Amino acid sequence: MKQMVFENFYQHETDVYSLEGFSPVIVDRAYLEKLGVTVHASEETYAKLEAGSRVFMERWKNRTVLPVQHLVLEDLVPEEVDTEIHNYTGRCPTLTFEINPVKGCNVGCQYCLVTDGVHEQQLVAYENYHLYVRYLLKEMNGTPTREVTAEELRRKDGLLKELAQCIEKNPAGKKDIERRITEVSRGKNWNHYYYFSPKTEALQEPTLRTGIAHRILKEFIRHYEEYPDSNARLFVASKAGAKHLLCEYEGETILDLFCQLKDKMQYNVSVSIMPDAFRDILEPYAAPIEERLKAVRLCREKGIPAEAALVQPIFTPYLTPEHIRSFFDRLRAEGIINYKPEFLTACMENLAMLGQILGHFDKDLERALYEDYIMPENSDHKKQRGRTAPDRALSIDNIRRMMDYTKQIGMSTSICYWVRKQLRIGNDLIPIINENGFQCLGYQSKLFKNQ
């Protein structure tokens, strides 16, 4: 087993350990009442907030809140990897396969959708993950040897309907249906996105300093050379900064490799709406916003599609008209024409940590944050793994307020099916495929030659 210690490309001056005057507290009923929270939560919610506070207190004391820069390198058997479909709803527009070469994440986001902000697990990267990517691309999007039958199309559509029902009623059965969908997709060269990387940061130190990211991109280049009619498309969503894109391995940078994929890929920047000082604490090893937008600029200067943003998480109390204008003006100035908004979703244990860190900077924002999430009537507004979203009426109002402004500056909006269903957003407000060709997470439908 190989191991390595690495240096980060970016690191903020202050982190959760060195934040002047901060130490964790217990968020319970008494704390919320003293803060001025007028919403009365359920006993279960109070218990989870208190439990999360105690866990955070222990992790802060033991200095295990942030990931450590220690990496274990392993190999895998490409044919034995369990192919994952990126689909939380069963209604995603195109079958999307996940590329996840790292277990854990070095960026260390304290609101992480995958780990609920816990980064204590060992970072593990698979050095030969590119061989799995080669195998998957060939199996799914190598030139088909025969025409697809109507029965196969019906079978795929039927399995997707089963998947949608399973996710809602029997999540434990999701894997089995995904395997069947993968099997029926094999050898068909259907339209597929390959998402690099939904469960971790694609362009982080463990993938860059080892060359793993470079090798994965080279596999896509190799695939298109061998199969020029392939309907595989690469989707990269990232918090990377310019330094990440310019990281060189064996004589080539990530940007060099992107240039060879420019008509087969898209690069979507991931940015959040929250106070800057708060963001520095919550995203300890992510590139600053100005560096992420510089990465967008580098892509666009080279003709690489980089016109969409994942705007997440959005902290609702911070979403004032002034902040809406300044945030989206900044994106639009860099050529961003589409955004996918998503409000913070958090389990109550994680919310207790996020709330008190926010309160260190602004107690009014902390109070508003709890009030947006903990009311009993909002307890069923949950995403996967029990993560609570903000009040539905507030969410709809905030989406409309963002859209009212972004339409004025020529930006379109796309949303995932889960948000569409939960908030009952119709095609009249946000079309499935919008005027700029974007859908769902910000997938660009125009990347496929048959659309």
Language model feature labels by segment:
Residues 161-394:
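Conserved AdoMet/S-adenosylmethionine-binding subsite of the radical SAM
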Residues 1-98, 103, 107-111, 119, ...:
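Flexible, acidic/Gly-rich N-terminal and inter-domain linker regions that tether
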Residues 85-86, 95-118, 152-153, 272-274, ...:
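Domain-start "cap" segments at the beginnings of catalytic or binding domains
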Residues 105-114, 129-140, 321, 325-345:
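Hydrophobic, aliphatic-enriched repeat segments that assemble into extended interaction scaffolds
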Residues 107, 214, 397-400:
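A structural signal for well-ordered alpha-helical segments within the folded catalytic domains
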Residues 2-41, 46-47, 294, 298, ...:
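Auxiliary Fe-S-binding modules of radical SAM enzymes
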Residues 102, 114-117, 126, 151, ...:
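Acidic/polar N-terminal loop/beta-strand segments that form early-domain functional surfaces
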Residues 115-191:
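Conserved alpha-helical substructure of the radical SAM core
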